[in-house]
Amino acid sequence: MKKTIFLLILLFTTVLADEIDFNFDGWDRECYLYKPSCIPDNPGEDFEPVPLVLMFHGLGGEGEDNYDFTSLAEDSCFMVAFPSGMYNTWNLGPEAPGGHDIDDISYIEALVDTIYNYYPLDTNKIYATGHSAGGGFTNHLACATTKFTALGSAAAYLWTAFEHWGEGLDSDLAEEYNYLCDPMTIGYTMPMIHFHGRMDWGVFVEWGEMSAVQGALR
């Protein structure tokens, strides 16, 4: 199916923070965008392009929940986008909690392209990060798109490892399903970093063994 995208930008070039409303593939999508003050309203050809970071919220959240991240963007001169997932989550795969089948990957690719059309972005410095379900979606990006330079997640899994959830969390299954995110299969590698707390009672660190095997391949 051909993907279409329509964009309404509110005060896009005159203020530091904007809400962007997309209609992508028939769905109304929302994203908050932060432009640091180091970027002038009309940057000339000599202006050095800046990095872009996408930050993904967890299950039950929305983009504006992560807006405190803007102080770091202001200090270090990079742009930040805070997309909102449909139904307050992301498409992490058929067995992921609270998931759906909306094409979030294509939406995020279109979002990056659209921001690039309006702002001086360094396409070699496009990053993504997320927490919990947002971290799971960040991990999923490593297997599904080449838009990003590097990825970082916290309190999350690579949910493709759990697409056969009903068969149990046996580490032997990890090797069988490594093809879901194997650089030899998808043709590229992706720098990644992940953080997880041992006292996390929502996303158990012990369940990450299968995910870790695949993550090591990235």
Residues covered by each model-derived region:
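Residue-level marker for beta-strand->alpha-helix junctions and adjacent short loops that shape enzyme
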Residues: 11, 87, 133, 158-159, ...
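The feature captures the conserved acid-bearing segment of alpha/beta-hydrolase catalytic domains
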Residues: 150, 155-218
